Structure formats: C-alpha cells, structure tokens
Amino acid sequence: MSEPLIVGIRHHSPACARLVKSLIESQRPRYVLIEGPADFNDRVDELFLAHQLPVAIYSYCQYQDGAAPGRGAWTPFAEFSPEWQALQAARRIQAQTYFIDLPCWAQSEEVDDSPDTQEESQALLLRATRMDNSDTLWDHLFEDESQQTALPSALAHYFAQLRGDSPGDALNRLREAFMARWIGWAMQQNNGDVLVVCGGWHAPVLAKMWRECPQEINTPELPSLADAVTGCYLTPYSEKRLDVLAGYLSGMPAPVWQNWCWQWGLQQAGEQLLKRFSPVCASTSCLLRPRIWLPLICMRWHWHSCAVIHYRYALTGWMP
C-alpha cells in the first residue's frame, strides 16, 4: 500500500465503530494506529483484560516544585467507541497496534486566536439542512444503518469540508505533527499496510502531513518534562460521563441509547426503550401506534430522526 488508510471518525459513534471494525477485518493491515495517549503503548495489553466498560486511560503530570499546577485527562472507551472496536479487531488479526497522540501533559496550553472554521462550517451545514444542532445533523447524515456502504466517502467529504484550509489552532498543530510522525514511521517500515483511526478533524491534514516527516528508525519518542512526574493508568468510567450533554465535548448524546443502537440496531433499540420505560402495561392500540406512525414520520424526516422520536415516546408517551 502506497498510502495509509486514514479513517476519520467521530468519537463514540456507533456507525464509525461498525466502519472501523469492518475495515480492519477486511483490509487486515499490519499496523493499526489509533488516536490515543502514546504514553500508554507499553501497557496496551491491559486493555484486553476482562473489563466492564466503559473504562478510561487517565494520563497525568505533577510538577515536583509546585511551580505549575498538575494536569490530567481521561481517554474513555465504550463498546460502541470506534477506538475500542479498532483495538479489538486489530487484536483478532494480530496487527501491531499503537496509540499515536500526545498525552495531555505533553500538549501545549498556548492560547491561539485563530478563527474557528469548524464552528463556521457547522453553522452553514445546520442552516442548509435545517437541523437544530450538530448532534441531530450527525445522526441525520451518518448514523443511518442502511447507508453503511456509502459511509467512508461521506465521512471523508464531510470532514474535508469541515476542516477546509484551516491550519488549526496551536494545540491541534502540535498533536497532528506528532501523529503524522507515527504514520510516517509505520509507512517507512514498508512491510505491511497501515490503517489509522483518528478524529475526523485531523484526517485531511494527516493525509498530507505524514509525507513531510523525516525518516525515523524507531517509534517517535514522547517529549520529556523537567521536574515533573508523569504517568497513566486504567480507571473505571461511567456512561453518564460519556454524555455530551454532561459536558464531555467529545461525547455523543444518550450513551446508553448509543450502546443499544450498537448492539441491536435502531429499530430494536427503540422497541427495547418502549418496553423498559413504559410505566404501565400498554394496550394493543398503544403498541401499534409506533408501528403506524414511524413510517409516516419517515416520510416527513430522515429515517434516523426516528431515534429521537422513539426516545421521546418511550420516556414520555408523547408522539407528534
């Protein structure tokens, strides 16, 4: 392969998780490179123990002289996370797997006043599609299970338009330079295909940047911090903390719902919600309502918008 296969994803997207799993199983690359803290690479086997998901990698640093505050960050994994499915699929085909992102302690805290073209592009898309927010837009465009075949090209086009010609802020440029070095190193081995799983915002830039990296015999080294203690370990996490509505900016709304969509598919997940949250035994006519209304809703909206309708009906009994 003369080019790495760079798969831009949205973190914790069931559709992207299915795509990543399918690509690794069909392409069988020798290297699977995943956006995640590279300081955990020496302990990556710990991720394959019998965990109860979600779990998270916690990376931290503590300055010994107290001159600066310490820093820490979590990298969470749920079953429906593309990164988690990449790890599992890579393990099954015995690919060499590495995390390729800078841990939080190696990332710059520099403030950048560059305009946020991502928000501008999102705003244009929301106006064009008349969607309420970026989560609804994402569902509308990508979480439809019937569109899985077209998903790779749709994602590539979407993220290319989203990134445009923006250089990114200082932090993203620093992270992308490090990730590009990892891709360049894997390609320079010239002994097998390379597949990269990264946030879609980074994908268009990494597809070009890796070519500019100098040759490296060994895997890229992490920067060192003077007078600081750094480390990382696995920790339990919670579904609530995965929710974008709880303040986790890289999350998806309603992570329990996302997990059900991953396990069962959209329609069965909606039926499961109806059964679980119905306060009383439903009559036959009540059970028939969604089966009659859903096709009508689909005529009015995109199919995946029915997920929201399912959810609302299950929790409140209300339908439009």
PLM regions and their residue ranges:
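Compositional signal for N-terminal targeting/processing segments
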Residues: M1-P320
